[in-house]
Curated annotation (Swiss-Prot):
Subunit composition and interactions: Homotrimer. Interacts with the inner capsid protein VP2. Interacts with the outer capsid glycoprotein VP7. Interacts with the outer capsid protein VP5*.
Residues annotated to bind Zn(2+): 153
Descriptive protein name: Intermediate capsid protein VP6
Keyword Methyltransferase on entry: no
Post-translational modification: The N-terminus is blocked.
Homology family: Belongs to the rotavirus VP6 family.
Molecular function per GO: host cell surface receptor binding; metal ion binding; structural molecule activity
Binding residue positions for Ca(2+): 266, 286
Keyword field: Calcium, Capsid protein, Intermediate capsid protein, Metal-binding, Ubl conjugation, Virion, Zinc
Subcellular localization(s) per the UniProt record: Virion
InterPro entries xrefs: Capsid_hemagglutn, Rotavirus_A/C_VP6, Virus_capsid_a-hlx_vir
Note: The VP6 trimer contains a zinc ion located at the center of the molecule. The zinc ion is not essential for either trimerization or transcription activity of the DLP. Zinc-depleted VP6 has an increased sensitivity to proteases.
Upper lineage: Viruses, Riboviria, Orthornavirae, Duplornaviricota, Resentoviricetes
Amino acid sequence: MDVLYSLSKTLKDARDKIVEGTLYSNVSDLIQQFNQMIITMNGNEFQTGGIGNLPIRNWNFDFGLLGTTLLNLDANYVETARNTIDYFVDFVDNVCMDEMVRESQRNGIAPQSDSLIKLSGIKFKRINFDNSSEYIENWNLQNRRQRTGFTFHKPNIFPYSASFTLNRSQPAHDNLMGTMWLNAGSEIQVAGFDYSCAINAPANTQQFEHIVQLRRVLTTATITLLPDAERFSFPRVITSADGATTWYFNPVILRPNNVEIEFLLNGQIINTYQARFGTIIARNFDTIRLSFQLMRPPNMTPAVAALFPNAQPFEHHATVGLTLRIESAVCESVLADASETMLANVTSVRQEYAIPVGPVFPPGMNWTDLITNYSPSREDNLQRVFTVASIRSMLVK
């Protein structure tokens, strides 16, 4: 993997910097590195593809070295370099695709394709010029079963979940009380509602709670907490739990009271926030508990009192909500996030070449399925294919 990264980095630099008119002295170190790559690769043969519709391709390396000059690089020099660069780039692209479509239930962190296994040999270590990528560093750590750490922006840590629970219900569905939520990606939105606006509740207050368990521990997380859940702020028709009927939800938004957020790790509270909104942080956690209250307004203007009558029918439904967004966090496991395209890169290649479903990943690389059942085998394989995708993205956008 180190060699593949170094190949890609060298080729990217060569493609960007070996251009007509450049002073040789400005790129002499790069050309020396480029020539070392050629010397190491010459005389070797590789084969890629042969899975799904990914075609089999054979690769042979027999290239001349780039020479030295006291002057600027001319058109002939650059053309010679370009021919070599283009072949190597095509090779790296195919090695990456070949690796991204393979998976293994055992030791999935290790190279799986014949070409990358061969590149892992000792004879190619002379190409290992650079090891600065976060993905490469973590791949090496994971390969040695040491602790890794990825920094994510808006990590896709929550499997998609959208549902409701009713704490009070009737066959007519005309006086409901309960909770709705939508968990997806890096965001939780939860709303508590009471058609009667807590008219008969103790102290005219309804208590709500929403608990979310993460599939992986997050650390040093920066989080945004808002006293609103905009996705539940407009009317909608909802199918009943048994699917036998539908019921009408017509929210009127109130501000939640006594908001408390707890971040827990292995059942122990690590951080707690009460009535604090905006930016908060959590040190390390695997569970989030949100609790909040709907309180009937003690004083109401006639217009507000008309919204919340003391008896049925209840045409407007008192609603309070919270939004929690994980803006950034560190995780020992690789995740899809908002700042990178690794999941899309891997999935698109597997779809384009009709790669059959293997023993590890779900059909279509369904992220909700993958993260819901994030086994050690999936973690190893995902870290490997994401690392390869990061290498490929240096050359192929």
